[in-house]
Amino acid sequence: MPVLHIAAALSEVAPRRAPRAAPRRSRWRTLTLVVALTTATPGVANEPAPDDTPDLSAYWTRERKAVALNAGIVGAVGLYGFTMWGWGETGFEARSEGWFGRDTRHGGADKLGHAYTGSVATALGAALYRRWGYDEAHAARLGALSGVLLTTAVEVGDGFSPKHKFSWEDQVSNLAGVGFEYLRLRHARLRERMHFRWEYFPSPAVRHGRHEDITTDYSGSRWLLAFPLRAWGLGDSSLKWFELQVGYGTRGFARRDERYFDAARRHPFVGIGIHIPLVLERFGAGAGTRRVFEHIQIPGTALPLPP
């Protein structure tokens, strides 16, 4: 609206032939222009005195930020669970889902998904805490706390859902992922030598619009541990550009996948890949960017390729 007032005022104050009453009208439009400018332009007429501005930085100490973050995790998870996942529609119930057997619902891919979620939640939490001024050790502990809080809140909430239920196998996987990342954060040598990654390329069901949630698109996912060769004594060799990988994925377990796969299959694998963090380092990428690819595997940069 201030732009409209300015345009109208300028059109009225421009020289032109007009009746004698026009100047009065122009004064009203000019007044509108002044009001619009003083209310729309910061620091011209309505800037508060310095003493009137609350010092939020002094209030938001790193401790308060940590409390707010973890309270926000619980609140956001609860809100989403009650509105989207049907939490609270039944009493609490637990069930065993098994691990990696052929007769399980997802062939064990979901267990690696839980572990990966715990790992990434811990890494992201620790990064936030470091930014807020915590040292490496304290940030790692708080990151692990946030990772446990997030994954446990989801799993306990699932216990009150008519569809999912609480699974001890899921919770063990959650804690394993949190614990693994905590150890990586506390021990730089381990962090250099082992990366836990997710590789994703949309499955046929997603590409054809039959499924939308990529986090449960197990036929498009696989998870792996990568061992960069440069961290295992080969830093001066041309082999430093490569890494050994051990991983697992499944295909065709979901009903939506039946038309695209002839059978449900599990795919453990051992392979070799390009060490992307080193490539990025040579191109001048910062540490933050390189850390992302400690957790993400780019499709097509490792063999064997997914089935």
Model-identified regions with their sequence ranges:
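N-terminal secretory signal peptides that target proteins for export/translocation
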Residues: 1-25
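N-terminal targeting leaders of membrane proteins
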Residues: 20-23, 31-111, 115-134, 237-240, ...
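Transmembrane beta-strands of outer-membrane beta-barrel proteins
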Residues: 150, 192-196, 240-246, 270
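Interfacial helix-loop-helix junctions of multi-pass membrane proteins
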Residues: 153-175
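Residues that define the transmembrane beta-barrel architecture of outer-membrane proteins
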Residues: 174, 217-223, 264-268
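Residues on the lipid-exposed face of transmembrane beta-strands in outer-membrane beta-barrel proteins
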Residues: 179-183, 223-229, 270-276
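Primarily interfacial, aromatic-capped hydrophobic alpha-helices that serve as membrane anchors
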Residues: 184-233
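Transmembrane beta-strands of outer-membrane beta-barrel pores
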Residues: 200-204, 231, 248-252, 276-278
